From Swiss-Prot:
UniProt name for this protein: tRNA uridine 5-carboxymethylaminomethyl modification enzyme MnmG
Family: Belongs to the MnmG family.
GO molecular function: flavin adenine dinucleotide binding
Organism: Lactobacillus gasseri (strain ATCC 33323 / DSM 20243 / BCRC 14619 / CIP 102991 / JCM 1131 / KCTC 3163 / NCIMB 11718 / NCTC 13722 / AM63)
Residues covered by region (Disordered): 203-232
Length: 631
């Protein structure tokens, strides 16, 4: 292919999925002339799998993206068809917002945002080869021969990298949803010395909603109380005309059909070589792994207002189409369901993420960043969070400024990236609340308090929005001071209220703050019983209530964070030679050499490293006896 010189940009982003759009928008909004390349303009921010955003941990990531100035929260708030808060009966650390998306509107709204963003050019092309000179990425070459030069490049190839779709005995080269695969770029990455591996994910069948018998299912409506992902959304805009999802179950007949056809299941016949996601297994995998269960939950989710396609959630499969039909028809409510699209598995290349820095810049090629599913994660939200960080750092790199990172105590995005670059991953990585040590600090409700300041410093939060944020912080401080001054006396009204929430009687007057610390006592109750208005904004009330009720636990986590910061401050020299440190265990030495931790805190998080190895490394550095620098 003959090449030709095309335009120059500050930042080029390859791939316009959920990672790519965040990366491109961030770079452009930071003032960099940005090019966003995509294999197909009709698949910008497309949802090839579940038509939803949020859920446990993931919903918090969307709030963090919004607090930093990203787009996902605004986009889903403009295009959802249902909104629900999950885990409302549990503590604030695990509450999670989830939205059912109109997948077509989601794509169109995001594409419109990109097309109207100054500094950002959107173009359809396939990136085939990177331009690398003197260990730095200087641009790329497309399949049409165009040479684009740039100061920074971000790769977000998703599942397109040497993608292969599998449906029973049928296999063919393809990206998600039958789009073109990217073949030459992963080959080019291997030539440049990157280690790649194969992962697999899957998607369930879609059925015609007109052929579903909903009377045999359980309706799952949205919340009436206004909920939003973006801190800029207004309660008055909350959608009242929401669409319901529906729940049904597999049964022993379904499981018998699956077991009878396991010899034709690519998951078990050896056709699929890639490692699949542990936390999103196929239905055939669930039936085999959990043989004692006689049923599995299935959610029927509408894909949008202007389509009858129904996503059969938790029913991911790569069985042959005829077997998929039998499986579907055995499920209550789906006996006469007509298949519109079969489920499929897709295998694809991922980069081993330990080859990345916390900025998501690659270690062996400067100014090259990777984000999203190609880093080994699963999920739109995980991809978008990485895309935002990669885009920010690509812009900073183009400006010759220091990189931007998030610590484990600052954001779920920080936990996600640290896990990837420190531990790598042997399977598609899904963010879970259990992965965060400081999850009481990393709540869904306080993402703005944690990150808006950082977004403003980066130039991604407007002055108007920042002023509103400052006003909210001041309102929280005023409400906290006010509730501590209020006294609740043991009146008959107070005693009746306490009895209604199953709390012990009050023997003497207490401050409103101490009264609120009691289980099931609310901020509104303190206002009513004291006869005083302490705050008007429900989000301000929420912050005060959580801060007081969980004061002891939050204090405990902050003590742990102080220890983390002390260890993070103990930096490890970039060119340290671990082979020159005596007494280090072989496994620790090998892991340190491979991952090249930046601090003692990161070294501590590497699996296979024991306390003795850390003590040796720490002492060696503290004594100033830095191992010989490699020549």
């Amino acid at each position: 292919m003959k090449t030709y010189e095309s335009n120059e940009y500050d930042v080029i982003v390859v791939g316009a999925g959920h990672a790519g759009v965040e990366a491109a928008l961030a770079a452009a909004r930071m003032g960099e002339k940005t090019l966003l390349l995509t294999i197909n303009l009709d698949m910008v921010a497309f949802m090839p799998c579940n038509p939803s955003v949020g859920g446990p941990a993931k919903g918090t990531v969307v709030r963090e993206i919004d607090a930093l100035g990203g787009e996902m929260g605004k986009n889903i708030d403009a295009t959802y068809i249902q909104m629900r808060m999950l885990n409302t009966g549990k503590g604030p650390a695990v509450r999670a917002l989830r939205a059912q998306a109109d997948k077509w509107q989601y794509h169109e709204h995001m594409k419109d945002t990109i097309e109207n963003e100054p500094n950002l050019t959107l173009r359809q092309a396939v990136a085939d080869e990177l331009i690398v000179e003197d260990g730095a990425c200087k641009g790329l070459i497309t399949n049409t021969g165009a040479k684009y030069h740039a100061k920074s490049v971000v790769l977000t190839t998703g599942t397109a990298a040497r993608g292969k779709i599998i449906i029973g005995e049928l296999t063919y080269s393809s990206g998600p949803n039958n789009s073109l695969p990217s073949i030459k770029l992963p080959e080019n990455l291997e030539k440049l010395g990157f280690k790649l591996r194969r992962f697999k994910t899957g998607t369930p069948p879609r059925v015609d909603g007109n052929t579903v018998d909903y009377s045999k299912t359980q309706e799952e409506p949205g919340d009436k109380e206004p909920r939003h992902f973006s801190y800029t959304s207004k309660d008055s805009d909350y959608l009242k005309d929401q669409m319901s999802c529906y729940m049904t179950y597999t049964n022993t007949v379904t499981h018998d059909i699956i077991r009878a056809n396991l010899d034709r299941a690519p998951m078990f016949s050896g056709v699929i070589k890639g490692v699949g996601p542990r936390y999103c297994p196929s239905i055939e995998d669930k039936v085999v792994r959990f043989a004692d269960k006689d049923r599995h939950q299935i959610f029927l989710e509408p894909e949008g207002r202007n389509t009858k396609e129904i996503y059969v959630g938790d029913f991911s499969t790569s069985m042959p189409e005829e077997v998929q039909l039998k499986m579907l028809h055995s499920v209550a409510g789906l006996e006469k369901a007509e298949l519109m699209r079969p489920g499929y598995a897709i295998e694809y290349d991922v980069i081993e993420p330990w080859q990345l820095k916390h900025t998501l810049e690659t270690k062996n090629i400067k100014h090259l960043f990777t984000a999203g599913q190609m880093n080994g994660t699963s999920g739109y939200e995980e991809a978008a969070g990485q895309g935002l960080i990669a885009g920010i750092n690509a812009a900073l790199s183009a400006q010759n400024k220091p990189g931007f990172t998030l610590q484990r105590d600052e954001a779920y995005i920080g936990v996600l990236i640290d896990d990837l670059v420190t531990k790598g991953t042997n399977e598609p990585y899904r963010l879970l609340t259990s992965r965060a040590e400081y999850r009481l600090l990393l709540r869904h409700d306080n993402a703005d308090l944690r990150l808006t300041e950082k977004g403003h410093e980066l130039g991604l939060i407007s002055e108007e929005r920042y002023a509103k944020f400052e006003a909210k912080k001041q309102a929280i401080s005023r409400a906290m001071a006010a509730i501590k001054k209020v006294t609740i006396h043991p009146t008959d009204e107070v005693q009746e209220y306490l009895a209604s929430v199953k709390q012990d009687r009050l023997n003497a007057g207490v401050s409103g703050a101490d009264f609120l610390k009691r289980p099931r006592v609310t901020f509104d109750a303190v206002e009513k019983l004291s006869g005083q208005t302490l705050a008007t904004d429900r989000y301000v009330k929420e912050q005060v209530e959580i801060a007081l009720k969980y004061e002891g636990y939050i204090k405990k986590e902050k003590t742990l964070v102080d220890r983390l910061h002390r260890l993070e401050s103990k930096k490890i020299p970039v060119d340290i030679d671990y082979n020159a440190i005596p007494s280090l265990a072989t496994e620790a030495r090998q892991k340190f050499e491979k991952i090249r931790p930046e601090s003692i805190a990161q070294a501590e998080r590497i699996s296979g490293v024991n306390p003795a190895d850390l003590a040796i490394l720490t002492a060696y550095i503290q004594q100033g006896r830095i191992a010989k620098i490699k020549k």
